[in-house]
From Swiss-Prot:
Underlying gene: cysS
Keywords linked to the UniProt accession: Aminoacyl-tRNA synthetase, ATP-binding, Cytoplasm, Ligase, Metal-binding, Nucleotide-binding, Protein biosynthesis, Zinc
ATP-binding found in the keyword field: yes
UniProt xrefs under PANTHER family: CYSTEINE--TRNA LIGASE, CYTOPLASMIC, CYSTEINYL-TRNA SYNTHETASE
Organism classification: Bacteria, Pseudomonadati, Pseudomonadota, Betaproteobacteria, Burkholderiales
Native species: Ralstonia pickettii (strain 12J)
Major site of localization recorded for this protein: cytoplasm
'HIGH' region (motif): residue ranges: 32-42
Catalytic reaction annotation: tRNA(Cys) + L-cysteine + ATP = L-cysteinyl-tRNA(Cys) + AMP + diphosphate
GO cellular component term, pick one: cytosol
Protein name, entry field: Cysteine--tRNA ligase
Motif ('KMSKS' region): 271-275
Cofactor note: Binds 1 zinc ion per subunit.
Residues annotated for ATP binding in this entry: 274
GO BP terms, alphabetized: cysteinyl-tRNA aminoacylation
Amino acid sequence: MESLKIYNTLAREKQTFVPIEPGRVRMYVCGMTVYDYCHVGHARVMVVFDMVQRWLRAAGYDVTYVRNITDIDDKIIKRAVENGETMSALTGRFIAAMHEDADALGVQRPDHEPRATEYVPQMLSMIGRLQTNGLAYQATDGDVNYAVRKFPGYGKLSGKSLEDLRAGERVAANDAKQDPLDFVLWKSAKADEPAESRWASPWGEGRPGWHIECSAMSCELLGEHFDLHGGGADLQFPHHENEIAQSEGATGKTFVNMWMHNGFVRVNDEKMSKSLGNFFTIRDVLKVYDAEVVRFFILRSHYRSDLNYSDAHLDDARHALTRLYTALKDVPAAVGAKPDWSESHGKRFLEAMNDDFNTPVAVSVLFELASEVNKTRSPELASQLAALAGVIGLLGRDPHVFLQGGVSADGVDAAEVEARIEERRAAKAARDFARADAIRADLLAAGIVLEDKPGGLTEWRRA
């Protein structure tokens, strides 16, 4: 394959991807804090970096993909206390729900999915190294903080100086901190907090801060210097900035070569928030839309652009994906076919994906290929369409299953459609063509398209 270019947030430009170890890629993505159901913003992170790791594997790399789970956090403690349950019961339930959502979206499981509570010893070790290196101090309130003024490179990911960051960020006043930007590495235990939320440490009982979790887990599983780190744009500062400060401050090595950030999700051109009443969980969305439609909707936009969620955009995605599946409906595609990168569509798909994972252009190539399949009825082109789409996790189902399946807001199910088709067949046999036409019109109004075939057969699909 040709060289892959990735927009590196740290360098603020596209760069040719060169792995540290030839043929091998180590990547880490910040995962979910599991105290509630995943929302559409989480869906985007899941799908985007699933697409990235799929493409890297398709390019022949040996990929180690790590996506963590934050299962110790102030919000988790608060929710568990409110519910009258243990933290482990709460997080276990929402980890299972997260996996269900990810599986539905066609997201492959990471190679490693570390839980923060399983890596506390590594976090304590890293905090100790930071203290030894003069970058951490225990404050009067018992917390251990990172001294940002002591790390010369602080601000390099966000591209801002300490003065700019202090002016631009709303940092809560804390007399125990040496600098308002200092952040917590180890939180001292509070008397009213549950026993399972505290661990013994050289600084007294407590729990890790959020930022140290990712530094410790990524370094433990991928090494102190690795290739790719991803996450949502909202994590660029302070979370990822703090990860760099922690990891490089502890090891003295470059932490990550390339940083990738996906754009925000907006709802009807507004920021998604519970207070605005436009907050949607993945489960909410999947009650109305087929999961592959949601995945397709996410991949139609470039990962770095903001994604505007709306019913109109999802409806459009459903119609578009239906067009692709329709092209494969009556033309047999070889099962398990591999992409032909020398074929013209394969070349352009390859060029698009190697240009910073440009899925909008790659998807446009799929539509051009679908048009060719419709014209030529070529099994070879149908196989190429299915193979290229499969690389990014699309068009993997039997076309008839997709076209007749999915979620329908009007509640029309397959059995009802088949019954109406039989009723229409009987009307035609009785030469009651007005009745037959009325049934077709009724079904079309309900989003069902009938296609009469030779031999008196009638096939159907959702519009």
